[in-house]
Structure formats: C-alpha cells, structure tokens
C-alpha cells in the first residue's frame, strides 16, 4: 500500500481530529467529508479501535505494513504495549525534527530528512523512519543552513513548545536528545489502548 499523499484535511475530517495542527479548513468543517458527512454514525467498538489506529498512522505518516511492525516490536518489549508504540513513533527522525520546531508539519520534516539536510552524530541520515537514541545529536548540514526552510526555522524556533526530552540550540538548530519520551511527555490526543485492542483480535 502506497503512502497517502492526498489532502490531509480530508483525513482529518474523516477521523475527526486535526492531524496537522492549526488546520483552519478542518476547524471550519470538523465533520466527515461527503454528502452525508454530518449524519450520525453508529460507532461500534471495532470502528473506534480502527479510527484510533488510523489517527496514529496518519499523524505520523506511517504505512500500514510499517505500523504493524512497530506494533509487534512494541508488544515484544517490556512495559505497556501502547506506550511502547508511541515511544517508537516519537523517536522517528522526521518526528523529532518536527517536535524540535525545525519544520511546520511532519510532512515538511520528512522532506527535509529525505533531501539529506540532516546529520545524526555527524553522519548524514536521509531516512525519515531512522530512530534516534538517547544522547544523539542532530545537526543541520552547514550548507543547508542558508536554505529557506532553515532560515525560517531560525526565526520561528521556540514559537512552539519543545518537549522536555529534546533540547534545541537555536542559533545552530542543533537538536539534543536527552532521553526517549515518557507517555506524559507525548502531547498527542490518542487512546493507544484502543490500538492495542485492535491488533489483539
């Protein structure tokens, strides 16, 4: 299954959650798209679980196959499966770039990574799904600092709260990974237990 590259607002409306953050089109019409979008739908337990899984997938921009692999890994780790899953998703490099404020959306962050603008521990990494570890140092390549996205990032970094597990050195746009996040540090409206229930059937 190919990655969804269509209008994200349409997915936001279908799942009834702002997948982008600050999506004015969603705020104007926060109901499902289509002729019968405002009609009430009987929400079964399965539908709620499916919607929660889809919210997570589209929020982080992950395909179903990859998401299922993340779930299996989370399930095999000690601790709560749902929290493990969110920790895995949050530790993706594209998400870290977004969380640090170097990109306005996760889609833009993915693009910055794939275009080879970033170094992790002084090594070029252009894979959005690359997973950061505690004490990793993420830098913008020297020649990339003069490009428009990073000029904008320099001016706007700090406008959005940075989670406590990350630190951004504004002038250099350096990201320090102090730790991997705890559930309380993941500011996202997801009921991860519903995702666990979906895959447990």
From Swiss-Prot:
Write out the GO biological process terms.
Answer: ribosomal small subunit biogenesis; translation
Q: Which residues form the S4 RNA-binding domain?
A: 91-157
Which PROSITE patterns is this protein grouped with?
RIBOSOMAL_S4, S4
One Gene Ontology MF term: structural constituent of ribosome
Q: Does the keyword Cytoplasm apply?
A: no
* Keywords from the UniProt entry: Ribonucleoprotein, Ribosomal protein, RNA-binding, rRNA-binding
| Highest taxon of the lineage | Bacteria
**Known CDD domains for this protein?**
S4
Q: Which InterPro entries match?
A: Ribosomal_uS4 (IPR022801), Ribosomal_uS4_bac-type (IPR005709), Ribosomal_uS4_CS (IPR018079), Ribosomal_uS4_N (IPR001912), S4_RNA-bd (IPR002942), S4_RNA-bd_sf (IPR036986)
Instruction: Give the CC-aspect GO terms.
Output: small ribosomal subunit
Give one Pfam family.
S4
Write down the PANTHER family for this protein, in alphabetical order: 30S 40S RIBOSOMAL PROTEIN, SMALL RIBOSOMAL SUBUNIT PROTEIN US4M
Question: What does the subunit comment say?
Answer: Part of the 30S ribosomal subunit. Contacts protein S5. The interaction surface between S4 and S5 is involved in control of translational fidelity.
Q: Which family does it belong to?
A: Belongs to the universal ribosomal protein uS4 family.
Q: What does this protein do?
A: One of the primary rRNA binding proteins, it binds directly to 16S rRNA where it nucleates assembly of the body of the 30S subunit.
The record ties this protein, via HAMAP family, to:
Ribosomal_uS4_B (MF_01306_B)
Record-given protein name: Small ribosomal subunit protein uS4
Source organism per entry reads: Rhodococcus erythropolis (strain PR4 / NBRC 100887)
Gene designation: rpsD
